[in-house]
Amino acid sequence: MSDKDDTETPVVTKATPSPEDGNCEPARNSESADQSTKPESKSEPVASTRKRPEARSSHDLDTADIHPVQESQALGKDPFSKEVAQTGWGYWGSWGKSLLSSASATVATVGQGISNVIEKAENSLGIPSPVEISTQVQYASGDTNTKGNESTSPVAGPFGVFSTISTAVQSTGKSVISGGLDALEFIGKKTMDVIAEGDPGFRKTKGLINRNSTLSQVLREAKEKEELRTTNEVTMETDRKTHYGLLFDEFQGLSHLEALEMLSRESEIKVKSILNSLSGEELDTLKLDLEQLKETFSLEEFCDEEEEEKKGDEDFTKEIMELFSQLHISCRPEKLTRARNAAYEWIETPLKKPLVEKEEEEKYLEIQSTEQVNKKSVECLFFQDIHAFAIRSLAELTAYSIELFHKTAALVLHGQKQEVTAIERSRALSQMTVVLCKDLSIMSKEFTTCLTSAGVKEKADVLNPLITAVFLEASNSASYIQDAFQLLLPVLEISLIESKTQLPQA
Amino acid sequence: MEAIWLYQFRLIVIGDSTVGKSCLIRRFTEGRFAQVSDPTVGVDFFSRLVEIEPGKRIKLQIWDTAGQERFRSITRAYYRNSVGGLLLFDITNRRSFQNVHEWLEETKVHVQPYQIVFVLVGHKCDLDTQRQVTRHEAEKLAAAYGMKYIETSARDAINVEKAFTDLTRDIYELVKRGEITIQEGWEGVKSGFVPNVVHSSEEVVKSERRCLC
């Protein structure tokens, strides 16, 4: 809350806390949040909101495919071919579809430098399967018919809050651009695919380009672009405070992601060469085992879970600790749980005692800018703080989650002899992914509720972009975590193979 | 958090297990000393800005590596993209000093075709009574490899700042003189963003980089 003072209007008004200021208490229900955000939904361009960096393959579009496993079997006979790697995982519904397919596609690239993209010779890249094309078409035609399609889409995912929000999507030429609440809309369903090109050919091109970059590259580029942009502008300080990518990097999320990608890539190469060296029955059994392992990475739990209540700090900590202990690795998730609980504490503070909080804020401001305080700026600062804190927390928790996955990968590969099977580990990790993502979605709701009540006096066009940004980044966070989780698959495959080959010897 | 920096240097910190690599870095980046710390798993990441001249900041990305042998295959991967390194040994542990040249050999193999500017760090100098390595022999060894030598203590915050900033300054000089250049595909040095000050000719983007170990 030590923000820079942004008072532009030097109106000399004494900042007395009036009763109307205590508007933080009632609006805990998302209903009011919806009300206040609805009106402007169409026209408002979301200035501070950045779309998730694109590195999506055309696979992302196949949100309609319900049985990817079967489909993948139909597509590629060889369960270890690219096709399967890319389509096999994505079941658990229509939200949070992520960079995964491109991430896992890229880990196969041999000797690819972190930011040094080498052309790949894989000719399968960028060419969508007939199934994808048909789903793309479906998708494209669905877009024009917004209401009918969208509202029936399952929004039972972690971001189910949006099921109550009616959405509007405008179709402008070849891009489908949705405004205002658009971000909310696609979080519920298609996550980052909202700005989908109606032109499949264009998508195809884009897919081709993007297949060659890993998630961390995309994020790094986005971050660097942002750094460049912010240095060129005067608004740097406040901008940086709310820029997810920069914050994510500050918490070393990018570095851990790169490190994880590296381990994943190496493992994948190893797996391939092992499979190439095997034949006959040996190969068939191993393939079967690996197939089983892969199934644990499908994150199906996302589908059938209902909207969950917010967990208490202890519950979350306990659950994560428990899952982590099931991995039998010498590392603990305290950094994450501590940060998570601290974030919740922060959220609850202003909600419980809004007046106190506000008075402090005003006092602080009075000191800061002597007389130049008006009531409006006080409120303004307050909800902007919430926004900044929300983005920061999301970036922090995501970075720590990815750090955990990175450490897990390192320990699975180079840890002590394992007492648990790779499948057991994958199950625990998969559950952990679900828990983390759900918690983030719940947290983002808490943040926006908080934001809505703090900024209830604000115009929707001031508040909405901030709310949208929080939801958007929460969705991105969840996607990153899932992507990172998927990067663990080759690592666990190696672990599985090693345990199989070690057993007879022992 | 200050956004503006002239360059970003990647530094790697290596040395035997338990010589205090993580503690040294934490003292430098977080300003405190952790009494107990778990052994590093694989590699860890830290960063800090250093002001080498008034208004001239360098962002340091510091790679903390596990000393344990079993993670060697992971940590090796990080040599290549480092411009500088701190090679630590524990002055109360003779073995860790004897291993210094093995560490240098190890890096030499894996850093090709690049070079790392190393500084030799005798750590835990607060435990002088338990010293097993004299300053003289450490200096001799460092000189033989063309390194500087410095003794530090993370616990008592002795020379921690100096160890990092001296190394940073040395690298900066080499960059300024064009002996280290920013290269495509190499992450050791990256150009940052300069405030509205004159950028001068320091920004060298040649494709050649000379040896300086």
UniProtKB/Swiss-Prot annotation, chain B:
Its cofactor is Mg(2+). Residues 67-83 are annotated as: Switch-II. Its EC number is 3.6.5.2. Changing G192R: In WSMN; impaired localization to cytoplasmic vesicles. Regulated by guanine nucleotide exchange factors (GEFs) including C9orf72-SMCR8 complex, which promote the exchange of bound GDP for free GTP. Regulated by GTPase activating proteins (GAPs) which increase the GTP hydrolysis activity. Inhibited by GDP dissociation inhibitors (GDIs). It is a lipid-anchor. It comes from the Eukaryota. Mg(2+) binds at S22, T40, D64. The modification Phosphoserine is found at S201. GTP binds at S17, G20, K21, S22, C23, S37, T40, G67, H123, K124, D126, A154, R155. This is Ras-related protein Rab-39B. It comes from Homo sapiens (Human). The gene is RAB39B.
